[in-house]
Amino acid sequence: MRALIPRIPTGRGVAAATLATAAVSLSGCGFLMGNAFDIEVGECLASVPQDGEVFNVETIDCAETHEGEVYANVTLDDGDFPGVKKIEKTVDARCSEEFESFVGIGYNDSELEFTSLYPTEESWNTWDDRQVTCIIADPEGTTGSLKGAER
C-alpha cells in the first residue's frame, strides 16, 4: 500500500488516501490504469485521488486534460520503518525541494499544489518500498506538462 498526502498551501484544504497496487490494464478515453508503485517522472494522472482506498492510478497522455503530473521520485533511507510522522516530514521537505526545480518558482509562490505517494509500514516491510512519488497538481485541470510553468 502507498499512502497519499496532499501538501496544499494554507486555506486550500487537506485530504488523505491510501493506494494499493494494481495490475496494468487498458481503459477507455486514453486512460491507462496503472500500478501505484510504477508511475514515473513525466507521467500525467487524469485525476489525483483525494481520500479512501484506491487500487490503481489513471495515467493519461499529458497532451490531454489532466489534474496531476509526477515531477519527482525520491528514495528514502533503508532501515526500520521510521513512522508516519517522520516520513511525512521527510516527504514534505523532499517534494518541496524538487518543486522549484520542476516548476521554476518556489512552492509558496505557486498557485499549483503537490501531493505525494509514500510507503506504508506494510509496503516498507513486505516489499522494501522506499520510493516517494511527488505529484504536482492543478485542481482546475491542465493540458501539457507543468514543467517550467512558473505559476
Show where each model-derived region lies:
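Primary mode marks residue(s) on the alpha4-beta5-alpha5 output face of response regulator receiver
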Residues: 29-151
